[in-house]
């Protein structure tokens, strides 16, 4: 009996040790366990090598860094993924989700890598990157004026191929040609046609999403609540976007100007004050923007000095004569002449405002829109405010003077007017709520080259943001998801389901729409698998 008891005890110990070892091995080797699981979704091992990159792969760092557009996040101390998956088929996305869940890894989804806080490729816990660079199909139907665009397609590629099909069609989307459709449409997406047709997200009519269960859903199968949430609510909180179906829009030739003003600040603020009071009131066919940056100049005495260069730039869906007449009647202080204006095709307008050509060039080669490496950035930080009433001239003097506190050319402000159709769209039409009552967006941007200068420049932009508190939107102070800013709040890392904590930043991005997003999240991802520092949390189970 004693022998039997001992034998039973010994066998139990062996079994316990065996299972403990396997559990510990599973925990200790999440990368290997993920790869073993993922191999089931890749029947050809040769193909697998082109889809999966681990830290042992000589191409790993090249793939990781290739679409990091903010060099703040390329240091040796920046957390790196255990695995990068570059799917070429939806089944690879399904496998990544299911295997990441199985072995306890988080997912970061990267389409173009333009997340200003690096959240599409950084996590503080072990993670996998799903890099959608190979999911870039664009299928255009000119007859119905729609297009299916996969998440990894760049805006430049979409503009290019739509123009190839019909030069009188385009899309209501952004300026930067290397931004990809996945994140841009999922976060809102403003651009030169915003006052005519709304945001990129306002023009989504269907979507393909892989959900937490690995199922591929379209608008019909996902339901209207989830479809609503994806369009401007940050699709990464709900699954992985495979493709958007977007509405294409009619575009005539456009007229543009970009005039530079160099003058004393007290004179300049009078122009700015005039702009504040009229830019949002213009007919929707005119977009009049302005931005400010410091440059070195030589004065009349031949001395070098630093001056603020102010640019007033337009996009007008009409002819030169009409624009000059309108500007001379409404804003004669700018002194716009015919010689300041250029009439361009819409595709050339996009090329100009993409920043890859000079204003006076006649060489608008649209092939540049296909260059996925164009316009690589240095280190930068962006913050944004929404302005609901004109800022006093005396305050704008102080705002502009603060540009001199930053390195020459490193700091910039930009003012982007609302109005037009944005006033007509309900704040609850999609999660993006910033509509009627907004005069303009005010961007604060700083950029630099050396990692060791990070704190210096971050302090400058945070100081100007704090200074602006009394003069911008409040209760809450509004923000824009596609200019993500972790300074405004993050989820509790110890309790990522904390609704109260998430509401701090959530209402700044989404206003009253935040609670509806939480309800959708609770229904479709109740265990909060798709999460990051600013992801929508589910409600606790007892509050469902």
UniProtKB/Swiss-Prot annotation:
Entry EC no(s): 1.21.3.8
Sugar-bearing residue positions: 45, 65, 168, 296, 304, 328, 498
Record field: pH dependence: Optimum pH is 5.0.
Amino-acid positions noted as binding cannabigerolate in the UniProt annotation, renumbered to this chain: 291, 416, 441
Record has rRNA processing as a keyword: no
InterPro entries: BBE, FAD-bd_PCMH, FAD-bd_PCMH-like_sf, FAD-bd_PCMH_sub1, FAD-bd_PCMH_sub2, Oxid_FAD_bind_N
Disulfide bonds: 37-99
PTM annotation: Glycosylated.
Tissue: Expressed in young leaves.
Cross-link (6-(S-cysteinyl)-8alpha-(pros-histidyl)-FAD (His-Cys)): 114-176
Cofactor: record remark: Binds 1 FAD per subunit in a bicovalent manner.
Region forming the signal peptide: 1-28
Catalytic activity: cannabigerolate + O2 = cannabidiolate + H2O2
Cofactor(s) this protein cannot do without: FAD
Main location class: secreted
Gene Ontology CC annotations of this record: apoplast
TM annotation in the entry: none
Quaternary data: Monomer.
Assigned protein family: Belongs to the oxygen-dependent FAD-linked oxidoreductase family.
Protein name: Cannabidiolic acid synthase
Annotated organism of origin: Cannabis sativa (Hemp)
Lineage: Eukaryota, Viridiplantae, Streptophyta, Embryophyta, Tracheophyta
Gene: CBDAS
């Amino acid at each position: 009996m004693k022998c039997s008891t001992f034998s039973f005890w010994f066998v139990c110990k062996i079994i316990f040790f065996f299972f403990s070892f396997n559990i510990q091995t599973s925990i200790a080797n999440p990368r290997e366990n993920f790869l073993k699981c993922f191999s089931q979704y890749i029947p050809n091992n040769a193909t697998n090598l082109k889809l999966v990159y681990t830290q042992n792969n000589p191409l790993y760092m090249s793939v990781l860094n290739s679409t990091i557009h903010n060099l703040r996040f390329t240091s040796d101390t920046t957390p790196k993924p255990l695995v990068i998956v570059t799917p070429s088929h939806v089944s690879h996305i399904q496998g990544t989700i299911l295997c990441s869940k199985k072995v306890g890894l988080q997912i970061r989804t990267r389409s173009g890598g333009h997340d200003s806080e690096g959240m599409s490729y950084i996590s503080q816990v072990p993670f996998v990157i799903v890099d959608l660079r190979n999911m870039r199909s664009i299928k255009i139907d000119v007859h119905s004026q729609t297009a299916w665009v996969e998440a990894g397609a760049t805006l430049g590629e979409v503009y290019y191929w739509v123009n190839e099909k019909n030069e009188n069609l385009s899309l209501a989307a952004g300026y930067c040609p290397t931004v990809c459709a996945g994140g841009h449409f999922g976060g809102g997406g403003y651009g030169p046609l915003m006052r005519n047709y709304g945001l990129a997200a306002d023009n989504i009519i269907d979507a393909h999403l892989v959900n937490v269960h690995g199922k591929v859903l379209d608008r019909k199968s996902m339901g209207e609540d989830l479809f609503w949430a994806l369009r401007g609510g940050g699709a990464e909180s709900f699954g992985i976007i495979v493709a958007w179906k977007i509405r294409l829009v009619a575009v005539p030739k456009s007229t543009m100007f970009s005039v530079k003003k160099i003058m004393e600040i007290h004179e300049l603020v009078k122009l700015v004050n005039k702009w504040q009071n009229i830019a949002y009131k213009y007919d929707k066919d005119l977009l009049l923007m302005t931005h400010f940056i410091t440059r070195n100049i030589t004065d009349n005495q031949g001395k070098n000095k630093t001056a603020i260069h102010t640019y007033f730039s337009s996009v007008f869906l009409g002819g030169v004569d009409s624009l000059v007449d309108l500007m001379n009647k409404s804003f004669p202080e700018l002194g716009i002449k015919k010689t300041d204006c250029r009439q361009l095709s819409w595709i050339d307008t996009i090329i100009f405002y993409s920043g890859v050509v000079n204003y006076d060039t006649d060489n608008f080669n649209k092939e540049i829109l296909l260059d996925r490496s164009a316009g690589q950035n240095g280190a930068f930080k962006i913050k944004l405010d929404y302005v609901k009433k004109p800022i006093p001239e005396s305050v704008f003097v102080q705002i502009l003077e603060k540009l001199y506190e930053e390195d020459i050319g490193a700091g910039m402000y930009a003012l982007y007017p609302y109005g037009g159709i944005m006033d007509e769209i309900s704040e609850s039409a999609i999660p993006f709520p910033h509509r009627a009552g907004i005069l303009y967006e005010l961007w604060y941007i700083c950029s630099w080259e050396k990692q060791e200068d990070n704190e210096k420049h971050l302090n400058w932009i945070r100081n100007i943001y704090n200074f602006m508190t009394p003069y911008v939107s409040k209760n809450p102070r509004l923000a824009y998801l596609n200019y993500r800013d972790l300074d405004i709040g993050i989820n509790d890392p110890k309790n990522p389901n904390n609704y109260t904590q998430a509401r701090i930043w959530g209402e700044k991005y989404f206003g009253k729409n935040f609670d509806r997003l939480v309800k959708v999240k609770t229904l479709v991802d109740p265990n909060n698998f798709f999460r990051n520092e600013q992801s929508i949390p589910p409600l606790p189970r007892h509050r469902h």
